Design a protein with these regions (language model features):
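Short regulatory helix/loop adjacent to the ATP-binding pocket of P-loop NTPases
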Residues: 114-129, 145-146
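Conserved alpha-helical scaffold flanking the Walker A/P-loop in AAA+ ATPase domains
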Residues: 61-78
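Interdomain hinge/linker elements that couple catalytic modules in large macromolecular machines
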Residues: 2-6, 132-312
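Conserved ATPase-coupling elements of RecA-like P-loop NTPase cores
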Residues: 65, 84-93, 118-119
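A short beta-strand-to-loop transition that corresponds to the Sensor-1 phosphate-sensing loop
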Residues: 109-114, 119, 135-136, 361-363
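Conserved P-loop NTPase "ATPase switch" module shared by AAA+ and STAND
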Residues: 73-89
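Conserved catalytic/switch belt of AAA+ P-loop NTPases
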Residues: 90-114, 122
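A cross-kingdom feature that marks ATP-driven nucleic-acid transaction machinery
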Residues: 1-35, 39-53, 57, 62, ...
Length: 387
């Protein structure tokens, strides 16, 4: 699909304005997957805070400046990248923030969830805002690239949402990026969490999960296939989650009679990593954009919006459930081409009224309303999410 898209270094992300605003108030922690665009966003923000200084813990010269606290006191914005790898990083940040020059802003970026690196030390409570940078969504591509919803979804299903493969004009370059990314991801980033001899097993797990998207995650089966314990399999999945590679969608069991599914379902942040047919890729894309929607509502509004699934003992299933606190707000079923809602979706729509119920369809001729269930085109419906 030929689209005239801006390159990844020149395009503002949808979060840019929000992060810029928060930098004037508190320390900002910006996390997200490797190559999701954090460094590019940081450098774009630096242009509005000149003079600014960027320091990366993985660069030896920068690491020395960080440990000696020898950065420029005149910098209006300090960017610390991958600082969570530093021992006692929370204590360091608290001291740096409390002792900063007047009016100096601070942005901390990292490719892992900060809460994963739990450690003793000073609390940052009350000093920071958190933002999570996701790959592109339908809405963000429309807002930043000026494409239609249909064009945006088609590109995301073809290339995934990471800036470089998504925005490049060359499909070959996108494929080369994907192959290298899948190889390097586990080999390089996982070493921050595990030992060298575990990397091969984690790579095998990563490859297995690419083929099990949307299925209940039975850790005992994975453990058996990999010849490891279930406890180790759980830890490995948690590592992949912490690096924003995969995420689990947990079952919603409140007020659902005969609820069965204890196992979560597994999805990838980047649909381009999924191995499966068009239906599986569409389901993963919807899951990833729903997670982005939830994280945006949490980060921007402080709302307790969460993503779940429902499956009962008769194996009736609703693909996705959005909840705010203890209240279901949305029921979402995903189909590639089937426009007819199931009896179970109708039943759950009545059960959770006034929650919105929708069947989003990838290839839909005509939107429709069947009782309380809306049948909507996937591209248009996804364009209406919060982010």
């Amino acid at each position: 699909m030929a689209l005239n898209l801006s390159d990844s270094d020149s395009s503002d992300r949808a979060l840019t304005a929000s992060v810029r605003r928060d930098l004037g108030r508190k320390l900002v922690l910006l996390t997200g997957a490797r190559q999701a665009g954090k460094t590019t966003l940081a450098r774009q923000l630096m242009a509005g805070f000149e003079p600014a200084q960027y320091l990366n813990w993985d660069v030896a010269a920068d690491r020395q400046l960080i440990t000696q606290q020898a950065w420029s006191p005149k910098a209006r914005l300090l960017v610390f990248d991958e600082i969570h790898k530093m021992r006692d990083w929370k204590t360091f940040l608290k001291g740096a923030w409390d002792g900063r020059s007047k009016g100096q802003a601070m942005l901390v970026t990292g490719s892992a969830r900060m809460e994963t690196f739990r450690q003793r030390g000073e609390s940052l409570a009350g000093r920071y805002y958190t933002w999570r940078l996701h790959p592109f969504s339908v809405r963000e591509l429309m807002e930043t690239q000026g494409v239609t919803a249909a064009q945006a979804l088609a590109r995301l299903l073809e290339r995934g949402g990471f800036p470089e493969p998504c925005l490049t004009q060359s499909a070959i370059d996108a494929d080369r990026w994907r192959a290298q990314y899948a190889t390097d991801l586990v080999r390089e980033d996982v070493l921050d969490f595990s030992r060298v001899h575990e990397v091969r097993t984690l790579q095998l797990l990563f490859d297995l999960l690419r083929e099990r998207v949307g299925s209940p995650l039975k850790l005992s089966n994975l453990a058996q296939a990999l010849h490891i314990s279930a406890t180790t399999a759980t830890r490995y999945v948690e590592i992949l989650e912490a690096l924003y590679i995969v995420f689990r969608v947990t079952p919603w069991h409140r007020d659902v009679a005969r609820s069965l599914l204890k196992e979560p379902k597994i999805y990838f942040l980047d649909t381009g990593l999924v191995k499966g047919d068009a239906g599986i890729k569409l389901e993963n894309a919807v899951a990833a954009m729903l997670l982005k929607h939830c994280h945006h509502r949490q980060d921007a509004e402080g709302k307790a919006v969460t993503l779940h699934t429902i499956r009962d003992k008769e194996r009736n299933e609703i693909d996705f459930v959005l909840a705010e606190g203890d209240t279901v707000t949305d029921l979402v079923e995903v189909k590639l081409s089937d426009p007819v809602p199931s009896a179970y979706l109708h039943r759950m729509a009545e059960r959770f009224a006034p929650a919105r119920a929708v069947q989003v369809v990838g290839e839909l001729r005509q939107p429709a309303q069947h009782g309380r269930v809306e049948v909507a085109s996937a591209d248009e419906w996804l364009a209406g999410l919060a982010a």
